[in-house]
Design a protein with these regions (language model features):
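NAD(P)-dependent Rossmann-like dehydrogenase/reductase catalytic/cofactor-binding core
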Residues: 1-132, 160-219
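Conserved anion/nucleotide-ligand pocket segment
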Residues: 123-145, 149-152
């Protein structure tokens, strides 16, 4: 199976760690993508299409390819509408630290569920289909926890290291919220919370001023 992976070094490392030697893969950064790579691929995993919209046009060169696109900060329906794709297509959770897990977290359009099982069988991966919404499931919940942890520090209730330790010991989480934020990347956390706020209009996604301050300091 010829798999093309588009993303940065972290995405490549997570993909390789998850699938190991099960599948031969073409590992290209998003800046090296070209028509020949796309034409030769059976399956394309694009971790960065939302930040590189020009990719969407290139994929028309191979309408037979199965497109797997990182849709955490948007929806699959919105992407298909924008790019007019006719491929077999699925959205996946491609946030750093969330791809290399036992389950692929996927979204699909109406009528697309029938092919998901077949594709994941070829990939030799377990999967779960979630609703096609901004934030999917795991990213939405985790980023809300991170945001609330920043509010806790801002209010002076506890220090970061104490919150991380309490969450690990008290809830059996593998990492505390601040460690998770570093793994995911604060920019991703900020951008997802912002997208959730725009999508839902709900106050619970309001970004903590301390989180925003840290995010802006990194830019």
């Amino acid at each position: 199976m010829d798999i093309l992976v588009i993303g940065n070094a972290n995405a490549h490392a997570e993909f390789k760690s998850k699938f190991g030697s099960k599948h031969p893969g073409s590992f290209k950064s998003c800046y090296e993508i070209d028509y020949e790579d796309v034409k030769a691929a059976e399956i394309i995993f694009d971790f960065e299409v939302t930040d590189n919209p020009e990719h969407g046009k290139i994929y028309h060169q191979n309408p037979q390819a199965i497109l797997m696109v990182n849709t955490v900060k948007t929806t699959l329906a919105e992407m298909v509408k924008n790019y007019h794709w006719e491929h077999t297509i699925m959205g996946f959770n491609g946030l750093p630290g969330m791809f290399n897990r036992p389950l692929l977290e996927l979204t699909t359009l109406e009528g697309g569920r029938s092919v998901v099982g077949e594709i994941c069988k070829r990939l030799e991966s377990e999967y779960r289909i979630v609703e096609d919404r901004v934030g999917m499931v795991t990213p939405r919940v985790v980023c809300m926890i991170i945001n609330e942890a920043f509010y806790t520090v801002l209010e002076g209730t506890a220090e970061e290291q104490d919150i991380d330790l309490a969450m690990k010991l008290g809830t059996n989480y593998p990492e505390g919220p601040f460690k998770m934020a570093r793994t995911i990347g604060l920019a991703h956390v900020y951008e997802l919370l912002e997208a959730l706020g725009h999508d839902t209009g709900e106050e619970r996604y309001k970004i903590c001023p301390l989180l925003k301050k840290r995010f802006l300091a990194e830019q």
